[in-house]
Curated annotation (Swiss-Prot):
It is found in: Cytoplasm. Keywords: Cytoplasm, Isomerase, Porphyrin biosynthesis, Pyridoxal phosphate. GO terms for molecular function: glutamate-1-semialdehyde 2,1-aminomutase activity; pyridoxal phosphate binding; transaminase activity. Belongs to the class-III pyridoxal-phosphate-dependent aminotransferase family. HemL subfamily. GO terms for biological process: protoporphyrinogen IX biosynthetic process. The gene is hemL. It comes from Aliivibrio fischeri (strain MJ11) (Vibrio fischeri). Its EC number is 5.4.3.8. This is Glutamate-1-semialdehyde 2,1-aminomutase. The modification N6-(pyridoxal phosphate)lysine is found at residue 265. It catalyses: (S)-4-amino-5-oxopentanoate = 5-aminolevulinate.
Amino acid sequence: MTKSAELFAKAQDKIPGGVNSPVRAFAGVGGSPIFVERADGPLIFDADGKAYIDYVGSWGPMILGHNHAAIREAVISAAQRGLSFGAPTETEITMAELVSELVPSMEQVRMVSSGTEATMSAIRLARGYTGRDKIMKFEGCYHGHADSLLVKAGSGALTLGQPSSPGVPADFAKYTLTATFNDLDSVRELFTANKGEIACIIVEPVAGNMNCIPPVEGFHEGLRQICDEEGALLIFDEVMTGFRVAENCAQGYYNIKPDLTTLGKVIGGGMPVGAFGGRKDVMQYIAPTGPVYQAGTLSGNPVAMAAGFACLKVLTEEGNEKRLADTTKHLANGFKELANKHGIPMVVNQVGGMFGFFFTDQETVTSYADVAKCDIERFKRFFHLMLKKGVYLAPSAFEASFTSLAHGPKEIEATLEAADQCFAIIASETK
């Protein structure tokens, strides 16, 4: 038994399921998860000392690579001045100014401690600002574990939301409407059936929680137009895409201006940070200037702000975002070419520094319904074959994977060499 397996067995005695976030348990791929002892650059090292090329990156935050000197030094310096004050600091101002500079639609910014806090607060603000109760999300899009967002589609576009987790009252979930990602008709139908009742649309501009699904041409433009016509706010949940698909986030990449934006992951540089922001007239509705309440003991934590600021300053140095995107594109194209070589049908999607692949004979994958048709068992097999060869991909067919600036030609070529061998094994098993 490996040390990771021993630790997993031990963890299950005191930690529910042995993990502090469900996907880490490898439930989506089977087997026992690796326990990480340390990480550096593009590599993580498990409890047995084995190194893996890491394409999870702590689920997105580690965009510079692990243990980056600039972030490490910023954290140490800030920690030496105190870990938390519960009072305003100048660092909060410089961080907010940098975020607004990079993301112009965020005229004002409120810092929080997680992506879930950010989306939860943005939705409360949208409801308070518009005076409407209902919200719209998309099937397969995840916006954190707030009750109103743990809702699935039901039996059709016009069906009221049903909870997708026990503990969420059905009466509460009925205020969440679910449309089909990349389908503007489903959005229009919901607005027609709920005229004047919908406060906002919240959407991942690139859906990263049903693997990696980019928008089809005109989808976000259509959402912007519909929200303008209906008096609803458009919220871009950029917790995953923020600063990862482009320097000015997915909204800059696709040239769309949302009313509110939520951020997380990259903005903290590995520390627990989230943020939401947007139009000044909307943000003025948040306490203490407005009636919509939101607060947090550790919001704007000085150590976390220092880490996030250092991360964004390095990331936005000239050429870095292009290098990240080029590296990811090379990897994604390599996966596709190797799958074709071995006669394995596959769709590979990539935007900026995120990518995903689907074992499917479909031409494209653009919605949750498409994802559900993919070969999950083949993904599980591929994941474990790659893991044995020292490549750590997202342990779920429904999660995107990520590169970092620390991933260089050496790591990409090693990954593709491993993939070539793994595809060959899978092809031989299906003949």
